[in-house]
């Protein structure tokens, strides 16, 4: 099944996947997935555990290679070639509990020598956090931890944001704050791909909803973004 938005005169696609499959031994995590992602849109991936959502996200991020099929980003780049233009936030925040938010970001910024990056304090402000907060991350609420993780992703000023379960373990208020943040990024023409079990939480910003079932695209439906 080929999943794509209706054809229209538009900029170069953010991503094009054609018949992408991924095998782990004899298990097919993805089966002939074809999808086009347009720039400046928000795509929400839903499906049961094991449907292939996180696998698809990791392939887009260049962290996994497909077993077959082709994927091109920003025209004609392979994911590993486009890594500098991609921001990937994993389900488990990659942060250090003993460091403050700004100390965490300074460390991760040091891993990108020579690459244009946001200042750590600026990245924290973008997600609504106070960079002067002198508290170790281990004392942050889950919502603050998730926003710090998102700030880490923003350091490299990515054009494509890949967010694996960004609303995980959040209370309702924190989830609403995250949705508001993502709405702002979407309006700045970033492309966003979200995996979630809570479709209703992402509904206000979803341009398209892609439902995976047993590694295949079962539905690719227009959303009703309100933000």
Residues covered by each model-derived region:
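Helix N-cap at the start of a conserved alpha-helix in ABC-type nucleotide-binding domains
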Residues: 172-174
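Conserved ABC ATPase "signature" region
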Residues: 106, 117-132
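Catalytic Walker B motif of ABC-type/P-loop ATPase nucleotide-binding domains
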Residues: 161-164
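Conserved ABC transporter NBD signature motif
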Residues: 69-82
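Helix-to-loop junction immediately C-terminal to a conserved catalytic motif
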Residues: 61
């Amino acid at each position: 099944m080929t999943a794509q938005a209706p054809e229209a005169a538009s900029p170069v696609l953010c991503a094009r996947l054609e018949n992408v499959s991924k095998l782990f031994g004899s298990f097919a995590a993805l089966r002939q997935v074809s999808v086009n992602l347009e720039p400046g849109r928000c795509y929400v991936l839903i499906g049961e555990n094991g449907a292939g959502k996180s696998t698809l996200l990791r392939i887009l991020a260049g962290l996994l290679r497909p077993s077959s099929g082709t994927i091109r980003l920003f025209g004609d780049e392979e994911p590993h070639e486009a890594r500098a233009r991609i921001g990937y936030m994993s389900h488990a925040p990659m942060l250090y509990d003993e460091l403050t938010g700004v100390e965490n970001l300074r460390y991760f910024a040091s891993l990108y020598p020579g690459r244009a990056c946001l200042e750590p304090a600026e990245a924290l402000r973008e997600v609504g956090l106070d960079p002067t907060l002198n508290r170790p991350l281990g004392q942050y609420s889950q919502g603050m931890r998730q926003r710090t993780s998102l700030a880490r992703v923003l350091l490299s000023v990515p054009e494509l944001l890949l967010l694996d379960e960004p609303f995980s373990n959040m209370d309702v208020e924190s989830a609403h704050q995250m949705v508001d943040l993502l709405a702002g990024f979407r309006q700045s023409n970033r492309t966003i791909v979200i995996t979630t079990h809570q479709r209703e939480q992402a509904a206000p910003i979803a341009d398209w909803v892609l439902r995976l079932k047993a590694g295949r695209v079962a539905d690719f439906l227009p959303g009703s973004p309100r933000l």
